[in-house]
From Swiss-Prot:
Gene Ontology CC: cell-cell junction; cytosol; immunological synapse; membrane raft; pericentriolar material
Enzyme's top EC category: transferase
Name of the encoding gene: Lck
Identification of the protein by name: Proto-oncogene tyrosine-protein kinase LCK
Enzyme Commission identifier(s): 2.7.10.2
Description of post-translational modifications: Autophosphorylated on Tyr-394, increasing enzymatic activity, this site is dephosphorylated by PTN22. Phosphorylated on Tyr-505 by CSK, decreasing activity. Dephosphorylated by PTPRC/CD45. Dephosphorylation at Tyr-394 by PTPN2 negatively regulates T-cells differentiation. Dephosphorylation at Tyr-394 by DUSP22 negatively regulates T-cell receptor signaling.
InterPro entries per UniProt: Kinase-like_dom_sf, Lck_SH2, Lck_SH3, Non-receptor_tyrosine_kinases, Prot_kinase_dom, Protein_kinase_ATP_BS, Ser-Thr/Tyr_kinase_cat_dom, SH2
Protein's cellular compartments: Cell membrane; Cytoplasm, Cytosol
Amino acid sequence: MGCVCSSNPEDDWMENIDVCENCHYPIVPLDSKISLPIRNGSEVRDPLVTYEGSLPPASPLQDNLVIALHSYEPSHDGDLGFEKGEQLRILEQSGEWWKAQSLTTGQEGFIPFNFVAKANSLEPEPWFFKNLSRKDAERQLLAPGNTHGSFLIRESESTAGSFSLSVRDFDQNQGEVVKHYKIRNLDNGGFYISPRITFPGLHDLVRHYTNASDGLCTKLSRPCQTQKPQKPWWEDEWEVPRETLKLVERLGAGQFGEVWMGYYNGHTKVAVKSLKQGSMSPDAFLAEANLMKQLQHPRLVRLYAVVTQEPIYIITEYMENGSLVDFLKTPSGIKLNVNKLLDMAAQIAEGMAFIEEQNYIHRDLRAANILVSDTLSCKIADFGLARLIEDNEYTAREGAKFPIKWTAPEAINYGTFTIKSDVWSFGILLTEIVTHGRIPYPGMTNPEVIQNLERGYRMVRPDNCPEELYHLMMLCWKERPEDRPTFDYLRSVLDDFFTATEGQYQPQP
């Protein structure tokens, strides 16, 4: 290969493509027949750019036209129904419900923001994922429902205005993996992965690599599968009547009460936590719930609504695979390799880093309070509830329900709960993850755990636990709370750990 400045023989057109340091132009194969434009300011742009998650866009749509990605049946007064593919004009863009007019019927009403995409753009394409990180692309493509050759195109995290192609592949050594290719821009508006062949648009690029791998790891088969999104909760529906909820299936019972799968107003699938009567003050609960509903993050279970008359109901988003501690023991959970387990730990650390940033405390962090979606996304539940419990069996150190094995020594001995006691609990949670749901301190009673901790004992490294991960656990279990790491640090280490275990890019054949 060569450019105007060198003839270094290399052929790697993956995301770490070589660009000449002097002319800033891609190093083109010497035997290539393609004639790229003469250097005239076409260097690859490299400013860093950050992207938000799947939230409503902050800036107004330029032409106010959107296209429906899914059909929507109205469920509230003032809603506007529409069919998939229908075009609408946005009249007011605020929050998660936008006022719109159908160009088909002329009717006006409110629509859920996540059911539509900007018209005359890439956003309606099933293979285009606008605000998706590299790591989340891997999570989505490796989720159930996707297969060899499943793919997506996303905005580049490192280069503004550029895109990356992510493809699911099978590796003989690593099993199912995701490989990433940088899509480069031409001055004339075209695109290329390898300069041997360029395309006027991304549609042409997708069409070409669907018909032939042409140097990629595999042919593109079908776009990454996603489920129809849950419509946003209606903002005014916070304190709701009990009659609006139908409890369908009892999912389990925990320290606070029972958990049910149910439906709100007959159409929205939700999880309902029914708290035991007398377990907490309704007034104290409502005050805390108003704080909890402000904590919105992709790694936190979304709190939708409450019933404030006893028995208190907490209505949240429904997570198909239930609690992490139970899921890890299922056939699907047992099959998860250490890479995926570490990814789950990284997701939880990400959510706890947000709680840390908000100066909030969980107080009961363990695998039983982590929920798992159908795409194996992990979300933190029950944050803040432990503080409100008025049951002595739960709050007293000797209480039968007190989670001794997850609780930091200062919280056991003095009732001192801080974000640093949450860090201790996170270290215990890591042992649950790598052992597929084993109870911590196997073979020990709660009093024995307390006695051993006072003597400086720490849990031994579980079987199959990487040394680096055990080192992270030991940092979480430092005696002095101030010596324990932050969740932001834990998140960064686990993110790097996850990336490192995925393996480096391989040269394209």
